[in-house]
Amino acid sequence: MSEPGIPKGRPRHWLEYISTAFAVIISLISLWVAIETERANRQMVAAASWPMLQVGSSSVDDKGDSVILFRVTNTGVGPAKVRSFELFYKKKPMTGAVQLIRTCCKPDFTRSAPEEEDRKDFFITGGVPGNVIRAGETDTFMQMGLGTANAAVWRALNTARNNFITYRICYCSVFDECWINTVRGRNQLDPTPVDKCPVPKVGYVE
């Protein structure tokens, strides 16, 4: 005699199928929530470290003196690593400030230290590539004061900066998300995302 019991091959009750399907659905929902939460967290961290570099120039310094200033400002919320910087005069790349002045304004221009420290016709330059610019900071990479000895050069450079000088800057966040900005003036709100910054054929040094 066979012992009484549940016969082999008994069809599963429909409730068992529903329970199994429900468990699978719950697992999928939990996985989706976890993925979306992780993505949202990454977006929040990226947004909290997002840099925005804007290149600009002016003809008056913070004291109101006649000084031509070329600056890079980080208007974002995170630090920016400057990978490359290019400056063009009439679409021709410049290697530095001296070449720019010789091309735009005075062919025989030479850099010379002023005899007096308080002379107004000073000329100061600095590099841009390789710098880390923190949020809210400004790097000034060229300054030229207006004096009696350099009035013609100063005015020529002022005309050039308003009409013929353009830039291309590539920078990255601390998470190595990178952007290229090529727009002049205030409309620099939509830099182009890139996988990595290209190496320029002619980079601006100083």
Can you say where each PLM-predicted feature lies in the sequence?
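Membrane-proximal alpha-helical anchors
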Residues: 2-107, 112-120, 199-206
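Intrinsically disordered, low-complexity segments enriched in small/polar residues
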Residues: 3, 74, 124-125, 134, ...
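Short solvent-exposed loop/turn micro-motifs enriched in small/polar/acidic residues
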Residues: 63, 124, 162-164
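Sequence contexts marking disulfide-bonded cysteines in secreted/extracellular proteins
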Residues: 103-106, 171, 179, 196-198
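Low-complexity, serine/threonine/proline-enriched polar segments
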Residues: 117, 123-128
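Terminal connector regions
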Residues: 129-193
